[in-house]
Amino acid sequence: PTMLEEAVKASLWQLAVYDEKELVAYIRLVGDGHSVIFVQDLLVRPDHQRQGIGRKLLTEALATFPNVYQRLLATERSEKNLAFYQSLGFVELSDQACTGMIYNN
């Protein structure tokens, strides 16, 4: 199996959306499901964007784990991404009483 196949198998939760037999959107969470979940992937094919599919997937994911203390994601910084995630209740870590860091090896 490839690294991607192993990563998908080890995921906490995932959901895919198909149009007929064609994959058009996918969300994948990692974490323990109790204290933390991390939105590892939220992908919507460009020709299916702006239709509410990503919003529905993320809403379903968050509703599946309502009592998790930390719900995190990391994404490319853009006004579009900021607006989308903020509309769903996410805030930037810099606005919180915590520090977000990444390890660069």
Residue ranges and their predicted role:
Residues 1-14:
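Active-site rim helix/loop that mediates acceptor-substrate recognition in acyltransferases
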Residues 16, 21-31, 35-43:
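Conserved beta-strand in the GNAT
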Residues 44, 50-63, 87:
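Conserved acetyl-CoA-binding loop-helix of GNAT-fold acetyltransferases
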Residues 58, 63-76:
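Conserved GNAT acetyl-CoA-binding A-motif
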Residues 72-82, 100-104:
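Conserved beta-strand-loop-alpha-helix junction that forms the acyl-donor binding cleft
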Residues 84-85, 90:
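Conserved active-site tyrosine of GNAT-family acetyltransferases
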Residues 91, 95-105:
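Active-site/acyl-donor-binding loops of N-acyltransferases
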